[in-house]
Amino acid sequence: MFSDKTRNLSRKFDQEHHYTLKKVLKYKQFCNYFVKRKKIPSLFITGTDTNVGKTIVTRAILQVLAQHNFSVVGYKPIACGGDDDLPTEPNQTDYTSEDNSDVLIILDSCPQPVAYRDINSYTFTHSSTPIFAALDAVHHIQEEKLDTDLSNLQQNYPNVVVEGTYGWLTPINKDLSFAEWVHKNNMPAVLVVGIKEGCVNHALLTAQAIQQQGVNLIGWVANRINPCLRHYAELIELLSKKISAPLLGQIPYIAQPHKKDLTSYIENPDPLLAYFQK
């Protein structure tokens, strides 16, 4: 039989041990909560269509952030080439090439050297790959791979600028769209509007869809893709009144913008800087 003194000591030890264990558990819960709350700032660049200038705007934003001393990297989850032939069989690899022009422009725009596969999860030569991936007919693009690659970048860089593929509602696979993936990852969006005939309808529908998805639209960028377009100024004025997010900048029709310093064209960077300074 144990003495009263021994039993008291044992009880005291159990109480202290239980108290310490509770403190450890509470500390772990706090850390987990803080990690969830303190997400690495990531920004998603989407567009009204394909070939509206998402990559050029991504370059401009990367350059602006670097100019303001942010450590930043770009990420193009899914890159598709210009081959319009229909894919006839499933891809055997996530990379049918490593020379996609969009990814290479983003590589060149990052303020520090990164590898191709660090900033891209899938590269396909066929432009129609997302359509057939959505039908689960060619290549099932894995959401987990996108999440892992984004997380790896977030662990190494304080700020990540992500460029989408085609438009806002483009499918990633048969179960998921870019809109849903962006919402899941709690990223705000910047909308790129290619200024051309018919762009008002495309811009307003896309802005509406972004906000209906519950994604914060930080702002929009006008990219002049038709140098002969009449009433350019009037279109900008109309879009500025109709889109409930600020105009961040206007990129003119210029030769080889992927080789230029585009920082001066983002004339209103404050909404971007405010987000990344949080």
UniProtKB/Swiss-Prot annotation:
Its cofactor is Mg(2+). It is an enzyme of class 6 (ligase). GO terms for cellular component: cytosol. The active site is at residue 76. Disulfide bonds: none annotated. InterPro entries: DTB_synth_BioD, P-loop_NTPase. Coiled coil: none annotated. One of its GO terms (biological process) is biotin biosynthetic process. It catalyses: (7R,8S)-7,8-diammoniononanoate + CO2 + ATP = (4R,5S)-dethiobiotin + ADP + phosphate + 3 H(+). Its EC number is 6.3.3.3. ATP binds at residues 51-56, 102, 223-224, 252-254. Pathway: Cofactor biosynthesis; biotin biosynthesis; biotin from 7,8-diaminononanoate: step 1/2. One of its GO terms (molecular function) is dethiobiotin synthase activity. PANTHER family: DETHIOBIOTIN SYNTHETASE. Belongs to the dethiobiotin synthetase family. Catalyzes a mechanistically unusual reaction, the ATP-dependent insertion of CO2 between the N7 and N8 nitrogen atoms of 7,8-diaminopelargonic acid (DAPA, also called 7,8-diammoniononanoate) to form a ureido ring. This is ATP-dependent dethiobiotin synthetase BioD 1. It comes from Haemophilus ducreyi (strain 35000HP / ATCC 700724).
